[in-house]
Swiss-Prot record:
Keywords: Cell outer membrane, Ion transport, Magnesium, Membrane, Metal-binding, Porin, Signal, Stress response, Transmembrane, Transmembrane beta strand, Transport. Disruption phenotype: Deletion of both ompC and ompF confers resistance to colicin E5 and to the toxic activity of CdiA-EC536. PANTHER family: OUTER MEMBRANE PORIN C, PROTEIN YDDL-RELATED. This is Outer membrane porin C. The chain crosses the membrane at residues 34-42, 54-63, 74-84, 92-101, 107-115, 142-154, 164-171, 201-207, 212-219, 242-248, 253-260, 270-286, 292-299, 319-326, 331-338, 359-366. Forms pores that allow passive diffusion of small molecules across the outer membrane. (Microbial infection) Supports colicin E5 entry in the absence of its major receptor OmpF. Residues 22-33, 64-73, 102-106, 155-163, 208-211, 249-252, 287-291, 327-330, 367 are periplasmic. One of its GO terms (molecular function) is metal ion binding. Binds 1 Mg(2+) per subunit; could be Ca(2+) in vivo. Residues 116-133 are annotated as: Loop L3. NCBIfam families: PRK10554.1 (NF007841). The gene is ompC. Its main location: membrane.
Length: 367
């Protein structure tokens, strides 16, 4: 019986963390779910910057309220707290925080810190036990989590076509801190140039049918003045992203691949951005009925014609071999081996890019 139960619950654990939420309140059209996890995590690596304790926890809630028969309000917040630092250090941050309205088949609109629409497709390969999803990053234009997202989403194409979803998104400018020497581009939530963005727009479309999925996404963002100084490579007026992906998720098999081409949008360590980058991620997983889920993946990000003495360089390149074992819906353990294929050379040293292998061991409690 335990084997059958695990075969049903494990796929549910692989989607958004809130899928495993604990219901706190559900009455009179108002619902509140609490979710979270604690990951006792340790890295083993020759790179002393990452070797050691990486323990963290995440906590969040999802709420909704029935305004009318046709209108529903909703909100979500998620926070991460590092458990590997001293008590007098403030190593915590908000991952997402947004609120919105859903108008039945017409669609939903929300605003806040959220995921960019490019992640609607690239998330298909961001399923590894620990690593993965690092040909892009957070606060990286519209490629993953970011601030100031206004998002319209439509599911099942106005209720007419099952599995056909699309989204349109706008991101407001997140620029310089005050007092940084710039006369323009200052915003109330300023940050360093590598995590800034100008006004941006994007869209995505995905179609799922009987386990098969196909999707595409594009985004185009203005770059800030601080991003176009001589301090960084990859100057340009706009940061653009073009993404396509495929997936298969059925019969205990999960296969996914995505290819993304970017212009002035893929970060090159601490050096800046690639004028052009070609990013590829592919993953294969199989879910055994007794709770074991092995995983194999390949990820590569190649920068083209980088400039400043660099030509074409691999920004990221590794094979990932891992496995997760689910004791039940609340408890799991995993091992993830990142086999780094990058060479230690002048480029990786200048950019501060890690070239060492990493083994991650984790024990997770989630609710």
């Amino acid at each position: 019986m335990k084997v059958k139960v695990l075969s049903l619950l494990v796929p549910a654990l692989l989607v958004a963390g809130a899928a495993n939420a604990a219901e706190v309140y559900n009455k009179d059209g108002n619902k509140l779910d609490l979710y979270g996890k604690v990951d006792g995590l340790h890295y083993f690596s020759d790179n002393k910057d990452v070797d050691g304790d990486q323990t963290y926890m995440r906590l969040g809630f999802k709420g909704e309220t029935q305004v009318t028969d046709q209108l529903t309000g909703y909100g979500q917040w998620e926070y991460q707290i590092q458990g590997n630092s001293a008590e007098n250090e403030n190593n915590s941050w908000t991952r997402v925080a947004f609120a919105g309205l859903k108008f039945q088949d017409v669609g939903s609109f929300d605003y806040g810190r959220n995921y960019g629409v490019v992640y609607d497709v690239t998330s298909w390969t961001d399923v590894l036990p620990e690593f993965g999803g690092d040909t892009y990053g957070s606060d990286n234009f519209m490629q993953q989590r970011g601030n100031g997202f206004a998002t319209y989403r439509n599911t099942d194409f106005f209720g007419l076509v099952d599995g056909l979803n699309f989204a349109v998104q706008y991101q407001g400018k997140n620029g310089n801190p005050s007092g940084e020497g710039f006369t323009s581009g200052v915003t109330n939530n300023g940050r360093d140039a590598l995590r800034q963005n100008g006004d941006g727009v994007g869209g995505s479309i995905t179609y799922d049918y009987e386990g098969f999925g196909i999707g595409g996404a594009i985004s185009s963002s203005k770059r800030t003045d601080a991003q176009n100084t001589a301090a960084y490579i990859g100057n340009g007026d706009r940061a653009e992203t073009y993404t396509g992906g495929l997936k298969y998720d059925a019969n205990n098999i999960y296969l996914a691949a995505q290819y993304t081409q970017t212009y002035n949008a893929t970060r090159v360590g601490s050096l800046g951005w690639a004028n052009k980058a070609q990013n590829f991620e592919a993953v294969a997983q199989y879910q055994f009925d007794f709770g074991l889920r092995p995983s194999l993946a390949y990820l590569q990000s190649k920068g083209k014609n980088l400039g400043r003495g660099y030509d074409d360089e691999d920004i990221l390149k590794y094979v990932d071999v891992g496995a997760t074992y689910y004791f039940n819906k609340n408890m799991s353990t995993y091992v993830d081996y990142k086999i780094n294929l990058l060479d230690d050379n002048q480029f990786t040293r200048d950019a501060g890019i890690n070239t060492d292998n990493i083994v991650a061991l984790g024990l997770v409690y989630q609710f």
